Amino acid sequence: TVAYINTEGDGRGFFEAGGSHSLESMVKEVTIDVIDPQKGVSVAERLGALDLLNGGDGNPGFYALGSGSDYTPFIQHAGIAAINIGFGGENQGGEYHTIYDTYGHYKRFKDPDMAYGIALAKIAGRIVLRLANSEVLPFEFGAWHTTVQGYLTEINALTTNMREAVEQHNAFIDKKVFSLTADPKKPFNQPIKKAIIPYVDFSSLHNALAGLKVTVDALGEKSLLSLTSKDVLNDKLMHAEKVLTFASGLSRRSW
């Protein structure tokens, strides 16, 4: 299995996509070729406009998949690249997994002329064709690297913010800020000092990501490879997601 494509809860509105970030670039490229049935522009252009309106840079994100849906065993257990796609935002919800989740309800309230169902089929179909017919699988790890780099930046910021918050909390106790500002007519429990947040050395992660960036950039030259080399590369690309899993299972949730 090369990849798993999941969709559910489709309706009118804007394209939504998430999944393995190795597939992010390919999915975004596909949305350039499909027209939004209500606006007459590409699905990508309309989604970019929404991102700008919401304060973004016009390049909407590709969310990471959680669990609780059909794609869960593929991406988290089998280590198969997976994506979840659909349209929404301009139709009411609340009927999902209820007795009202019917064809009649969908036809009346969700997508009356089935236009977005057709648009979704065009996107999913193009994704399947790209995966099936490309000489080299359309897996691109630049977005994956950028995403993981972002996670590391967030963790760095989190530890710094936590450390500063604890230092301020303890300083307030030393200066009796909490007791001096408490209402004497109300119950008051004096806060206790918190343990200092230690500094964490993330240098090994930074170095690993720097080395990975070199490899990711080198994959950009894959079109110059021989057919035999492409076959070898395809096998590695197809199993790349597996490397990100643990054979024993998730933390405190073994297989």
Predicted segments with their positions:
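Secretory-pathway/membrane protein signature
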Residues: 1-255
